[in-house]
Amino acid sequence: MRLWLHLVLLVATLEGVRSQVQLVESGGDVKKPGDSLRLSCKASGYTFSGYTMYWVRQAPGKGLEWVSRIYDDGSDVSYADTVKGRFTISRDNAKNLLYLQMSNLKPEDTGRYYCAR
């Protein structure tokens, strides 16, 4: 299982190097419980509008946790139960941008957030 995960990550990394895919997250900050925050992810090096996009996160000392998903055309979204009703994923295909609006933040939302395709 662990070897498989490392292999998948290696393949994803090599694909990114070959095609110059870049996903750059921004908007992180220190917040208090109950606050709101919007994260952005700028994509380049591929046809953004052709891919379903994801947000995942990693709490300190923990593994990766899936947060949310949005279809290529924005027609369907889904959320982890832990964030449902508080987080909203959206995208702007004209600007190659992915967003995660986070409201009513909780201590357990602490972590590093990543966008992925």
UniProtKB/Swiss-Prot annotation:
Chain positions covered by the region annotation Complementarity-determining-2: 69-85
Protein name: Ig heavy chain V region 3
Framework-2, as annotated region: 55-68
Keywords: Adaptive immunity, Disulfide bond, Immunity, Immunoglobulin, Signal
Region span, Framework-1: 20-49
Region forming the signal peptide: 1-19
Gene3D superfamilies on file: Immunoglobulins
SMART domains according to UniProt: IGv
Stretches the record annotates as Complementarity-determining-1: 50-54
Top-level taxon of the source organism: Eukaryota
Framework-3: annotated segments: 86-117
Disulfide bond positions: 41-115
GO CC terms in record: extracellular region; immunoglobulin complex
GO biological process: adaptive immune response
Positions in coiled-coil regions: none
PANTHER family xrefs: IMMUNOGLOBULIN HEAVY CHAIN
